[in-house]
Amino acid sequence: MPETPIDPDLTAQVLVEALPYIRRFRGKTIVVKFGGNAMVDEALKVAFARDIVLMRLVGFRVVVVHGGGPQIGNLLERIGKETEFVQGMRVTDAETMDVVEMVLGGLVNKEIVNLISAQGGRAVGLTGKDGGLIRARKLEVEQPGPENQVPEIIDIGHVGEVDHIDPAVVEMLDSGEFIPVVAPIGVDERGTSYNINADLVAGKIAEVLSAEKLLLLTNTPGVLDGAGHLLTGLSPERVDELIADGTIAGGMLPKIRCALDAVAGGVRNAHIIDGRVPHAVLLELFTDKGVGTLIRRQPE
């Protein structure tokens, strides 16, 4: 099958449009949370890896944080381990945590490293345990009780939240021009392992590194208004209004809160982008239109 001819005018247009963004973000830190359909579709995985390698080649300091919920669920099903969810979070006993570490720290993490390497990049996979990157604490989940009664605390096992980020190992890898690929597993002061939401880990790492941008890949176009239209740019104040009137709800809420926390914590911009679009990361960074919703710390 003959190759499709390359349109030189289109190529030139793309490069000219990208040049100001490359100049602007060169030397800046970009944290990317890899998840959703982009993690299971083979073509999207390759496109993502190419995007990451190109970002590093043009001088961006890139950190990848990944999830892996569907892959964890698939392996638990294969071994006959039943899964229970509370408020959308997987109840994680010791046996399930072993599976989580195997899948996130092993299978998924190393697959992403291999994908990046296959595109000419130099990636190093690690979990939050490596180099003391993520210190975790147990997540307390409150179950609302009857009116005027104290909420019940539900134990969902080895599910945690970020207590502290020590970026030394990430900074060391970056100084050697490696791309850190982080699995969201943390450990507390007693050595207990916890599975942590990957969006939250990406946001906290972005804060500590004073990142220019946090990119969260999703299975939606971004934040939509009541009529289903994409909202391309939002201030924190406007986000609060949309949450209050119910426009932002359901599964988008945790991602929005993660983006807001990151922006409040010093990240300049947070983006919620459609990971189903090939090369979504480059389109968001290097073009005027982008493919998602931008949340700014302040008007630019």
UniProtKB/Swiss-Prot annotation:
Keyword Kinase, does the record have it? yes
Q: Name one GO cellular component term.
A: cytoplasm
UniProt-annotated site: Transition state stabilizer, residues: K33, K255
Family annotation (NCBIfam families):
argB
What top-level branch of life does the organism fall under?
A: Bacteria
GO MF entry, a single one: ATP binding
Q: Does the keyword Amino-acid biosynthesis apply?
A: yes
* Record's function text: Catalyzes the ATP-dependent phosphorylation of N-acetyl-L-glutamate.
Which Pfam families does the UniProt record give? AA_kinase
Organism (species): Halorhodospira halophila (strain DSM 244 / SL1) (Ectothiorhodospira halophila (strain DSM 244 / SL1))
* Underlying gene: argB
* Chain residues that bind substrate: G68, G69, R90, N195
Which chemical reaction does it catalyze? Answer: N-acetyl-L-glutamate + ATP = N-acetyl-L-glutamyl 5-phosphate + ADP
Matching entries from SUPFAM superfamilies are given as: Carbamate kinase-like
What pathway annotation does it carry?
Answer: Amino-acid biosynthesis; L-arginine biosynthesis; N(2)-acetyl-L-ornithine from L-glutamate: step 2/4
Q: Where in the cell is it found?
A: Cytoplasm
Q: Which family does it belong to?
A: Belongs to the acetylglutamate kinase family. ArgB subfamily.
Which keywords does this chain's UniProt record carry? Amino-acid biosynthesis, Arginine biosynthesis, ATP-binding, Cytoplasm, Kinase, Nucleotide-binding, Transferase
- Main location group: cytoplasm
Under InterPro entries, the record lists: AceGlu_kinase-like_sf (IPR036393), AcgluKinase_fam (IPR004662), ArgB (IPR037528), Asp/Glu/Uridylate_kinase (IPR001048), Glu/AcGlu_kinase (IPR001057), NAGK-C (IPR041727)
For this protein, the Enzyme Commission number is 2.7.2.8
Quote the protein name from its UniProt record: Acetylglutamate kinase
Per the UniProt entry, what are the Gene Ontology biological process annotations, in alphabetical order?
A: arginine biosynthetic process via ornithine; L-arginine biosynthetic process
Q: Gene3D superfamilies in the record, alphabetically? A: Acetylglutamate kinase-like
